[in-house]
Amino acid sequence: MRAVIQRVRHASVSIGGQVKSAIGPGFLILLGIEAADTHEDADWLCRKIAALRVFDDADGVMNRSLIDVGGEALVVSQFTLMASYKKGNRPSYIRAAGHDIAIPLYEYFTQTLSGLLLQPVGTGEFGADMQVELLNDGPVTICMDTKNKE
């Protein structure tokens, strides 16, 4: 499971010209799921994201988490994060989980993160053609991979 976490002032996702979800200050999370991912991967990633200390404290030091600041989260499924580009110039998405695996894990991820943040999490629509708008804050962008925990 891979996530690109961006600290934002605000973000929204639209489908067919209609806003589906919008958030204020917090994280826009692009989430890629592969066939080998499990609930344990989602649990680890949700805990890390909720506790990630990248918001400024009173001294201007990145020392506060999304939980600490009461920030919001918007999670958008992004199968292209699982791209393999080792061979040739056209990315392969063979590692990306199919709908039968990815949809339940995506829903589990958003429910788990919502429980940790004690508030609803905004979502896109799995498999839809979406337009994502955001205003980066910092910018602060963190990439996490449950198969490569650095």
Regions found by a protein language model. Give the residues of each.
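N-terminal, polar/charged subdomain of small-to-medium soluble alpha/beta proteins
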Residues: M1-G88, I103-E150
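A charged helix-plus-loop insertion that forms the helical arch/lid used to bind
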Residues: K87-I101
